[in-house]
């Protein structure tokens, strides 16, 4: 149970995101303000299945999973800002722009994702995201998500 209204623990994250192991990439929400920003954490463990092949002897978190972790953080911010979806509605990852990778993320790192709301237009919501390890930027991108009914 959360004692601070600006923190979300894993139980609350599981209520908001449809992702499950091994694809749930947000461990905890550290802080958020509805409609403005969210800070979340991903604890990177050598036990994650993708490290077996990426890369043997030199495990590095795949860049697409860093982006996915940031996208999941934007999804949580969207859910907390807009409220519960109607039955049959989902948030979809709709696009990414200006993605840049600055340094590798390795097992043992604690990756902080910071996402900020930019604007909503024509059903698309735009977010700016940055991922950090030890206060240093490892990735940054602009992401869009769309609210849509299931097909």
Curated annotation (Swiss-Prot):
Keywords: Cytoplasm, Lipid A biosynthesis, Lipid biosynthesis, Lipid metabolism, Lyase. It is found in: Cytoplasm. GO terms for cellular component: cytoplasm; membrane. It comes from the Bacteria. The keyword Transferase does not apply. SUPFAM superfamilies: Thioesterase/thiol ester dehydrase-isomerase. One of its GO terms (molecular function) is (3R)-hydroxyacyl-[acyl-carrier-protein] dehydratase activity. It is an enzyme of class 4 (lyase). Its main location: cytoplasm. The active site is at 54. It catalyses: a (3R)-hydroxyacyl-[ACP] = a (2E)-enoyl-[ACP] + H2O. One of its GO terms (biological process) is fatty acid biosynthetic process. Its EC number is 4.2.1.59. HAMAP family: FabZ. Belongs to the thioester dehydratase family. FabZ subfamily. Involved in unsaturated fatty acids biosynthesis. Catalyzes the dehydration of short chain beta-hydroxyacyl-ACPs and long chain saturated and unsaturated beta-hydroxyacyl-ACPs. This is 3-hydroxyacyl-[acyl-carrier-protein] dehydratase FabZ. It comes from Klebsiella pneumoniae subsp. pneumoniae (strain ATCC 700721 / MGH 78578). The gene is fabZ.
């Amino acid at each position: 149970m959360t004692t601070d209204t600006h923190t979300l623990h894993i139980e609350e994250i599981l209520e908001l995101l449809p992702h499950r192991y091994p694809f749930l990439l947000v461990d905890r929400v550290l802080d958020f303000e509805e409609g403005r920003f969210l800070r979340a954490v991903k604890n990177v463990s050598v036990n994650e299945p993708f490290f077996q092949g990426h890369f043997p002897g030199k495990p590095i978190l795949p860049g697409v999973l860093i982006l996915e972790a940031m996208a999941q953080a934007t999804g949580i911010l969207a859910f907390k800002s807009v409220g519960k979806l109607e039955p049959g509605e989902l948030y979809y990852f709709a696009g990414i722009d200006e993605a840049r990778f600055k340094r590798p993320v390795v097992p043992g790192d604690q990756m902080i994702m910071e996402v900020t709301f930019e604007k909503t237009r024509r059903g698309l919501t735009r977010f700016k995201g940055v991922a950090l390890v030890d206060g240093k930027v490892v990735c940054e991108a602009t992401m869009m998500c769309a609210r849509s009914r299931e097909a």
